[in-house]
């Protein structure tokens, strides 16, 4: 009886995830409303409460927004979702968007031209920019360095706390196995690295006690440590740096790979060495 109940719950969860994982939206100028209607039919996603704030990422341009999700009855919207996307994606004609949703708090989408159905692709030199709604959010140029943000006792509050970080995202994206995976550069002088809290929050990441590290030589395991202040550290990266003979001027990037795609649980970290 208990086994049948567990199977039923698993089936319901998978069904919910299947309906929201991928969907499409069409924008027509002067006809489409500012709020974006989402194919979610209740205030819960995969059995979890609807997140108030979500991250929306354009694969076509690199733009990133923090948006508010709201429910009206059984209908769910991204507040001003179309308004923000149309403005920042320079939309003047009808477009077709293909979305992927992780079921927790991150949306990715690609833009297709409505007439030709050609997929928009960004130049490798374009920067990722997070679009924010208030002073409580932080404007970020990319994930190259989060040191200034991580060490700040609190985010937002004044313009002095806002940060624009220089980017080398064109180099990073060229080396990733999947450009949609979260990634971050590593300080090669340390034996452990802090996984950026912004990355953890945006992708709703969770970690096992031990994680697989994969480089060009093979695989090994390293321990994940969570401090009392909730900071997440990956230990034992010094040996990875040494065995890959990383030279001064090179850059090391960790690409986080999750179970079954974008479901939050990190099971493997791919090591990428970017030569100077």
UniProtKB/Swiss-Prot annotation:
InterPro entries xref list: B3_DNA-bd, DNA-bd_pseudobarrel_sf, Plant_B3_domain
UniProt xrefs under PROSITE patterns: B3
Protein's name in the database: B3 domain-containing protein REM22
Keywords carried by this UniProt record: DNA-binding, Nucleus, Transcription, Transcription regulation
Main location: nucleus
DNA-binding residues (ranges): 11-115
Gene3D superfamilies: DNA-binding pseudobarrel domain (2.40.330.10)
UniProt-listed PANTHER family: B3 DOMAIN-CONTAINING, B3 DOMAIN-CONTAINING PROTEIN REM22
Gene Ontology CC: one annotated term: nucleus
Pfam families per record: B3 (PF02362)
SUPFAM superfamilies in alphabetical order: DNA-binding pseudobarrel domain
Record region (Disordered): 141-164
Biased composition (Basic and acidic residues): 144-154
Record GO terms (molecular function): DNA binding
Compartmental location: Nucleus
């Amino acid at each position: 009886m208990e086994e049948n109940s567990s199977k039923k719950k698993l089936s319901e969860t998978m069904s919910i995830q299947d309906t929201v994982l991928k969907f499409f939206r069409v924008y027509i100028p002067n006809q489409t409303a500012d709020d974006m209607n989402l194919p979610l039919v209740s205030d819960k996603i995969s059995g979890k409460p609807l997140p108030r704030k979500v991250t929306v990422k354009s694969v076509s341009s690199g733009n990133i927004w923090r948006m508010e999700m709201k429910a009206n009855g059984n209908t769910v919207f991204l507040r001003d979702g179309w308004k923000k996307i149309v403005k920042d994606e320079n939309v003047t004609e009808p477009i077709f968007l293909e979305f992927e949703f992780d079921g927790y708090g991150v949306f990715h989408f690609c833009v297709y031209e409505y007439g030709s159905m050609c997929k928009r692709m960004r130049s490798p030199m374009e920067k990722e920019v997070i679009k924010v709604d208030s002073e409580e959010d932080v404007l970020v140029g990319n994930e190259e360095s989060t040191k200034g943000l991580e060490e700040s006792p609190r985010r937002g509050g004044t313009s002095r706390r806002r940060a624009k970080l220089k980017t080398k995202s064109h180099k990073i994206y060229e080396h990733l196995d999947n450009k949609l995976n979260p990634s971050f550069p590593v300080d090669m002088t340390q034996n452990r690295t802090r996984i950026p809290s912004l990355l953890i929050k945006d992708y709703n990441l969770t970690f096992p006690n031990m994680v697989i590290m994969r480089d060009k030589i093979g695989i090994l395991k390293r321990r994940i440590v969570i401090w009392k202040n909730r900071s997440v550290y990956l230990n034992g990266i010094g040996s990875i740096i040494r065995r890959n003979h990383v030279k001064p001027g090179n850059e090391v990037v960790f690409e986080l790979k999750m179970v079954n795609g974008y479901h939050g649980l990190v099971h493997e970290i791919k090591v990428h060495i970017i030569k100077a």
